[in-house]
């Protein structure tokens, strides 16, 4: 595949056979959160070397420790967060880390607070573990989504034990500021609550915004947080199954040690090796990708303003996901169905992100810019035919 992102074609992407381009044949894939830009050369080189060695058995302790050290170095360099290597644990993915957090770090049966719209599995995983999800819709202030602190406070008062915090936020693209997180922490601490902080999109932040790990803010946040992250979104590795659970206090580390054998089962050798290479050698590739995505998020705004001005859009501060307000189109609560059927463009239905997502759609713009332009053209033409 071409290393010039503009030169990658729809035919190239379909030939790869990835989920985004194979699940709905003949369409433009702008739904599932994976990118169309291949992978960083240091990552693929590390994978080839591991395959050539035949490293297909159980995860070696030394390989897991290398990844922990790599992430700790990345966190220190990029975020100024000094995390002890022993507190970075190898996991299969963010959802596995959430399952461990709910099962072993909250009171049995306690509900989970979820600001919505939200990453879709956050709505479905807690109920599979016997936990109620209390949706607290985000508020919009001055054109930006913010947390409803009164709603979060009320949910904790009603017996919830855990707040799921997603930063950078999927799907709305907010990158929380320190003051916002300090206010959230005050509410959590007042109720003796816990926070699960999903920071998988942290490397994908645009100029003018800075990622601050929630657990790094204060001793208070460190004491009540388990953080989950991975190189999988920023370096396009979701199928390789590796992530990091980051513990930020001694009590959690001791508790984690009691369940680690089960909790950490599933992190794959190749995924761990790929994460290590990404954190240690993937910076230049990531910088090029983020610069390209920055152009895409701006171009998406221009295209929508020109072709479909009825769709509301605010360029995200992080992630490669555009949150499209389609309510003015008067096409119902599930606009993605129209765009898939009549435009041949597959988006993620906002309803899947919770009740607050009705009438919205999530657009993955991590694609070649000519394909992005083609997608919006097809959407506009479909609406014009109605």
Predicted feature residues:
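Conserved glycine-rich beta-strand-loop-beta hairpin in the small C-terminal domain of fold type I
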Residues: 276, 293-301, 313-326
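PLP-dependent enzyme catalytic core of the Aspartate aminotransferase-like
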Residues: 73, 334, 338-347, 353-386
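Conserved core of the PLP fold type I
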Residues: 56-186, 203-204, 211-216, 220, ...
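N-terminal small-domain helix-loop-helix segment of the aminotransferase-like
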Residues: 2-93, 100, 280-281, 386
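Helix C-cap/helix->beta junction micro-motif
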Residues: 129, 190-191, 221, 343
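Conserved core segment of the aminotransferase class I/II
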Residues: 219, 223-294, 383
């Amino acid at each position: 595949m071409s290393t010039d992102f503009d030169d990658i074609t729809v035919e190239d992407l379909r030939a790869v056979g990835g989920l985004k381009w194979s699940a709905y044949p003949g369409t433009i894939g702008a739904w599932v959160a994976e990118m169309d830009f291949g992978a960083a050369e240091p990552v693929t080189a590390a994978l080839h070397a591991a395959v050539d060695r035949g490293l297909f058995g159980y995860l070696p302790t030394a390989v897991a420790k290398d990844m922990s050290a790599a992430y700790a170095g990345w966190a220190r360099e990029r975020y100024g967060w000094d995390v002890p290597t022993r507190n970075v644990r190898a996991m299969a993915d963010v959802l596995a880390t959430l399952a461990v957090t709910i099962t072993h770090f909250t009171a049995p049966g306690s509900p989970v607070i979820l600001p919505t719209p939200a990453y879709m599995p956050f709505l479905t995983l807690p109920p599979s573990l016997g936990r109620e999800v209390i949706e607290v819709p985000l508020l919009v202030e001055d054109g930006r989504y913010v947390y409803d602190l009164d709603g979060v406070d009320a949910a904790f008062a009603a017996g919830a034990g855990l707040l799921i915090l997603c930063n950078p936020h999927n799907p709305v693209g907010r990158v929380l500021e320190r003051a916002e997180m300090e206010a959230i922490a005050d509410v959590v601490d007042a109720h003796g609550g816990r926070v699960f902080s999903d920071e998988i999109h942290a490397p994908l932040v645009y100029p003018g915004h800075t990622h601050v790990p929630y657990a790094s803010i204060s001793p208070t946040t460190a004491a009540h947080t388990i953080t989950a992250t991975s190189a999988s979104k920023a370096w396009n590795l979701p199928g390789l199954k590796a992530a990091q659970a980051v513990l930020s206090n001694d009590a959690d580390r001791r508790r984690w040690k009691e369940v680690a054998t089960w909790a950490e089962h599933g992190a794959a050798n190749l995924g761990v090796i790929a994460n290590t290479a990404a954190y240690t050698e993937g910076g230049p590739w990531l910088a090029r990708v983020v610069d390209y995505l920055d152009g895409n998020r701006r171009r998406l705004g221009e295209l929508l303003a020109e072709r479909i001005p009825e769709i509301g859009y605010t360029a995200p501060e992080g992630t490669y996901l555009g949150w499209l307000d389609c309510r003015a189109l008067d096409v119902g609560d599930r606009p993605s169905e129209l765009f898939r059927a009549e435009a041949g463009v597959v988006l993620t239905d906002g309803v899947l992100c919770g009740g607050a997502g009705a009438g919205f759609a999530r657009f993955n713009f991590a694609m070649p810019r000519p394909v992005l332009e083609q997608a919006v053209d097809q959407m506009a033409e479909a609406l014009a035919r109605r």
